[in-house]
Amino acid sequence: MSIFNNVKLKLSLGLGILLFGMSSIFGFQVSGENFDANFKISSWTATKNGSVITSEGIVGEGYGKVYLTHTFSSNNPEGSSGDFVGQARTINKDGEMRFASLQGIWKREGSIVNMYTLDAIDNGVMNYAKGKVDLFAGTLNFEVYPID
């Protein structure tokens, strides 16, 4: 093997490793079984340190009517990103009620807030959800991914 071929091989190998590493860093994607959860904002309250948004909607997967409360805190003066905590209550037609804790991060771009949340339900079910809040339209739309 000539020196030229050896350098070419090492360069190709290094470039391949670099591209694979970059795709791992910049290619975070969630996939798998999921369901939609759509809500209407019922109130939006300003606080000294952020906002509290309550919402409600009908969600499949046995959840039924779902009520959410999210307390948002900003990590910058522009109010363009931060974290949140929240609670959920669900009631289905059979009268089965569930409670959940919600926590995650958010980033606002104009009137749209992108949310990334991890939810723990009182029956042991855990979900990851990503969604969009349209502050002008008053809607929250999530893709929910059950965590095994």
Kindly give the residue locations of the regions a language model identified:
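Secondary-structure boundary elements
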Residues: 1-4, 24-26
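Bacterial N-terminal signal peptides that target proteins for export
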Residues: 2-14
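Bacterial N-terminal signal peptides
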Residues: 12-24
